[in-house]
């Protein structure tokens, strides 16, 4: 459907219930990687079914390790089945981008989030937060690229920052 929002999650209810995976498939290749990520969570939940309801759900870092592992399995399978050098190069660039986003970008999100909480407690405005975010973006990318000014508002597009405080630390 045109205009459909992307998004996905996996919900492991209890040890004896097959996990639910929700994925809004928009027809983009990225959706396949998202599915691999969520299926990583699902497989992890299924492998934990011998646990009781109190120990079934893992900590966020462990859960995200399983989901990123799902992405790596997909990447390995795509690389092994592809013969075109240019497609393989594209796959490698996407893998590097994903690895950077999974590790470094998440660390910068957490850094911003910690600073933002302190700033809000001191009465900071959204403009103050945007300026701080932009400073961290420029620090993150250094001289490797010029960060357009409108990216100061990117933090508002990251639901984890305001809907699930400190979720990004798990990566």
PLM features: residue spans?
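Cation-handling catalytic/transport regions enriched in His/Asp/Glu
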Residues: 1-171
